[in-house]
């Protein structure tokens, strides 16, 4: 089974899980770990304890809120130090939904394609992609002649 840990600063991960539950119903394979402002326990300890409760054959994904953030950096380091999971930085709801619903592990090129697909959800719906890709037209500057107007 795929186990998804949403890891964020503040309440973002809990809010994302709430959204997943609204769409999917029970999401017992989605878990939340948050870094609170006054937290004394390192987030890495929380994740290690959570992973210890999973089955040995589960595939674990830790989806973090921001690339380069303390949460993300701690998860990357933890994954390099022997705890087996895949880190995906900058998660969004479509990515989390797809991983939560997948009956099989998503790895390699398939995971890369899923991440690219999730990026397509980040758009300005009021400006079609074609318009955004087109070069902007330069406005013509008004011509002013120096001196008083000629009659």
For the regions a language model picked out, list residue spans one by one.
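N-terminal loops that bind phosphate or other acidic moieties
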Residues: 1-61, 67-151
